[in-house]
Regions:
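Short glycine/proline- and acidic residue-enriched helix-loop micro-motifs
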Residues: 128-147
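Residue-level preference for the first positions of well-ordered beta-strands
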Residues: 25, 164-170
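Acidic, low-complexity terminal tails and accessory targeting/binding regions
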Residues: 20-23, 95, 108-119, 181-237
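Active-site-proximal alpha-helix that buttresses catalytic centers in soluble enzyme cores
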Residues: 23, 28-97, 141
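Sec-dependent signal peptide recognition
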Residues: 2-10
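Short beta-strand scaffold positions
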Residues: 76-77, 150, 170-171
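Phosphate-coordination/substrate-recognition cap region in phosphate-metabolizing enzymes
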Residues: 61-128, 194-196, 202
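Bacterial Sec-dependent signal peptides at the C-terminal "C-region" and cleavage site
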Residues: 12-22
Length: 237
């Protein structure tokens, strides 16, 4: 009987220590480019399109917003616009911040559609299908959203198993949308439900590789010039 009590006591300690372990993730979408400012909106993907002047300004503003926070290392996508954004954020911080290029955070490959508008890529019928059923999207020479979700899970596990307590991610719209689904354990059908504007900032508490708590999502009131300055928290529909 004593052994049974000892077992449950040790088990309770293990559960308690597991519950108390919490890490923090900051998410920042890369700054505006001429592709995202285009009213027709072009699929950027892995195309090397630099930040425009507003994108640079907003990246610095995001850096100011985070300047007093312990943001740890900044893990950024290899795509240049994400690296640019990360560099501007790091320069605004009060302590030296290490930048780490992370291939798992690279933007989606939109294959033959990269650089095209949604209309050019999908047309009316397929474009509507993309909005209603993003989980069914198949792009010639591109990457499926399921493949993206799998590689993002690998990054999440790698962070959880590391000694780091804080992780800051600078990546892209499609990547952050899918990360939000992982955080909320939502299906790919909800891909459009948790969007962030360029240089929007989100903060998430990670309690295990399966348990997350969103502190705030898409904070952007510091982007005074933004056309979409709504500081909203989107809800899963």
């Amino acid at each position: 009987m004593r052994n049974i009590y000892s077992f449950f006591f040790l088990l309770s300690l293990l559960v308690l220590s597991f519950a108390e372990k919490t890490k923090t993730i900051y998410l920042i979408r890369n700054g505006e480019t001429d592709f995202t400012s285009d009213s027709l909106h072009r699929l950027s993907g892995r195309t090397n399109i630099p930040l425009n002047n507003l994108g640079i300004s907003h990246s610095k503003s995001a850096g100011d917003f985070l300047s007093n926070q312990n943001i740890g290392k900044i893990y950024h996508s290899p795509v240049p616009r994400a690296k640019q954004t990360a560099e501007h954020i790091a320069k605004q911080h009060k302590t030296k911040v290490e930048l780490v290029e992370e291939p798992l955070l690279i933007d989606a490959s939109f294959g033959i559609y990269e650089g095209k508008t949604y209309q050019e890529a999908f047309g009316n019928e397929q474009g509507g299908e993309f909005l209603l059923h993003p989980e069914k999207l198949i792009i010639p020479e591109g990457e499926t959203f399921y493949a993206i979700m799998n590689r993002l899970r690998l990054f999440i596990v790698k962070f959880w198993e590391s000694d780091e307590e804080v992780c800051t991610i600078v990546s892209h719209g499609s990547i952050i949308n899918i990360l939000s689904l992982i955080f909320l354990q939502a299906p790919l059908e909800k891909f459009w439900s948790m969007k962030m504007i360029p240089c929007g900032v989100s903060k998430v508490h990670m309690k295990s590789i399966y348990a997350f708590e969103i502190d705030y999502w898409n904070a952007n009131t510091f982007l005074q010039e933004s056309k979409n300055n709504s500081n909203r928290v989107c809800q899963i529909l």
